[in-house]
Amino acid sequence: MTEIKKPDVQSYHPNMGSDPLKLEKGWCHFSHEGIKDFLDYITAFEKQPDGVSFEVRTFRGAKALVNITFVSETAFRFQMFPHMAEPRLLNQVFDFSPAGAPVVKEEELFITAKTARLKLCFRKCPWEMTVELDGETLTREQIKDHNVDQKYKAVPVGFTVGDDGTVINAFETMYMYADEAFYGFGEKFNSFNKRGKFVTVWQRDAQSTNSDISYKGMPYFMSSAGYSVLMNTFTRTHFNMGATSGVSYTMETEDPYLDYYMFCNRDPKGLIRDYTALSGRSAMIPKWAFGFWMSRMSYMCRAELEEIVEKMADFGMSVDVIHIDAWQPNFEDSFVPSGVEELLSFDERRFPDPQGMIDSLKEKGIKLSLWMFPYVQAIDPEGRISNQFRTMSDRGWLVKGPDGKPRVFSPGEGDVDAWKVAALDFTNPGLVDYMKSRIKRLMRMGVGVMKTDFSEELPEDSVFFDGTTGLESHNKYPLLYAKTIYEASREAKEEMGEKALLWGRSGYAGSQNYPANWAGDSSASKNNLHSLLTGGLNIGLSGVSFWGFDIGGFYNCDYSGQRVIPEDEEYIRSVQMGLMSPLSRSHGQSTPREPWVYSETAQKAFLKINKLRYRMLPYLYSTGWETVREGIPMMRSMLLEYPDDPNTRNISTQYMLGGSLLVAPVFDQPKHHVYLPEGSWIDLETGARIDGNRWITYPKQIDVIPLFLRENSMIPMLKEAPLHIEDKNFEDLELVVNIKDHMEQAYCDDGVEGIFRADLRDSILNLTVQDIPVSRFRIYAAGVVEQVFINDTAAAFTTDGSFLTV
């Protein structure tokens, strides 16, 4: 390394060098007590083929190694190794390939590393990293957040040393702009903008969807300043996003080193594209998955299942999937002599001839979804040990404890009196092969999808086959579980020329590679819908697109704690938002969610939005392909589509479904306020044109969810709603268009990439259609239309109030 002259350090710390131990006090935003240390000044640096390395002296006289690696021209990796020590385990989520050598220069006060667009400036003394994008400062580390006594309120980038001298955590502290906002962190339900919040990423069985305890926390967030950060670890992470200081935020990992990626792009869509280009994008899911899923916990036998299918047909609803939770032998069956030993088999006493049942469902246009969890029942309340536990333990396929025996624990948060389970070890290749073979068997029978439930509660003292601990792999476990089941499903489905998906509860950074997800156990209450939407928006900004929630709410209790069906309005509002979400599954805990058990008003409201969704399937599927190509979520926060509008930065009560449709679900608000960004919008309920760039008060109607068509955009729709989705390209479409002057929009179907253009000028409307099977247009024009041309050929049209039919 090239050595750098030692600076006069004392001048930078006039009040701290004499009493450094005072740095320990008052740091409530850190999770560990101990001696804090931080990077002080550079002593040497060395150019690397893909970045630059630094030897840095710390405040307490130790040394640290800092490696900077560029992974694209606008993204880099920051690694800090205290005491110059390589860790026992680099517990990384991703190891992105380097993108080539930056230009590294030494200047009088700085070392700089530069790509075509990104420049990192490292101050020699005191250590400080500044990030510039296209010649302008984007962000920088915070090195001077002090109290009046000149003691640090937020300590600069550094680490904590325990009593035995080992490093027990590491942290980064960044400057926070006065108006900076933060989004993401996975499926966090409690707030949209995380400024001023504490966030911990540690998967838990949340048992609700209205707090920041979540099934799918992710150590990834996006800043309104034009960058995003992924803490590149599976270990528990903590984020103090300005909760204890209005000028700094801190990221902490319980690793003995620091490892994160920073992506730089002033366009929030660009940030998601950049992140998913490296971390992965979802493969396309089956077309039928965009239909309606019917479920309850649970249909208990084949006769009941087939009765529900018959009732759905009689009711006239459009539906494509039915789900069974309790399809396997009862848990008790594994505790009797000669009881069940293998996993994932039908209980043929309750579901006789499962192959015949699946074939019968297929003939009726219905796919089958089945529940699973990644545990085996170990010990029942009477202390008996299950046959499955013995079998899996004998094969060495269970996660162990410190004593080398299978680690037994309660499967849910706080379930101390529940049946005890042991976890399948997805780091063991033997177990992975076994589970894949069991899943492939089900897929080849014709099962459509597996619901991968649970996986969040592995204890920290667990020991895995690959040698990692519960601290290191607790967050990784849900991802390994999803990966195993998804890969098995995909491999089997590809043999049959079909697409695959999961219906997964838990996950982590990178979950978009194993679609899809649902929000977990949600309440039926109307105000809880807002929490669900917040979770959906946050996980979308974290790279996950194919997402839904339990329509009707998974649970609902009366004042005595008894389970009851939701009230009509609770059910209706949930149905409306759920059917205008990326994926739509109705599900409930023991009480029914079938629409016919509710009032006539609720039934009509259900059918109205159910049929509208099915008419919109070409739009939804095309938007799904946009996710696959670009990583942009289907359910989009308003700031994604309108990043330059400051009004959108904190809106979490509405969203864009794709780029054309604004959805403003009704919760429990006394008055329903909707923000319409710039342009003029078409109210799809009334056909009225409404000027934007303002808030409006929308009249609440029980059968209406406000939907608005964006200016200069279109929605491809089916003319009639089918009962089921066929596995073929959509045909005979109607394009619903809101045109002011000029627009161009892509359309995608399997193997089809079409383009639609519209130009309105001097009362002449020119429509250009390429590779879109359209037979009718419904045109909402902002001006007078006297002539219409389609692909340069004059076309007849009629006027019906607010729109033209062509």
For each predicted feature, which ranges?
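C-terminal substrate/ligand-recognition segments
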Residues: 295-297, 305, 311-314, 320, ...
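Beta-sheet entry/capping signal
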Residues: 75-76, 119, 128, 219-220, ...
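Catalytic core of carbohydrate-active enzymes
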Residues: 486-492, 500, 507-517, 539-549, ...
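Residues that flank catalytic or metal-binding motifs in active/ligand-binding sites
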Residues: 64, 109, 127, 216, ...
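Aromatic- and carboxylate-enriched substrate-binding clefts and catalytic-loop regions
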Residues: 81-83, 90-93, 134, 318-606, ...
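Short, hydrophobic/amphipathic alpha-helical packing segments
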Residues: 185, 195-198, 214, 305-306, ...
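N-terminal accessory segment at the very beginning of proteins
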Residues: 1-283, 287-288, 297, 302-310, ...
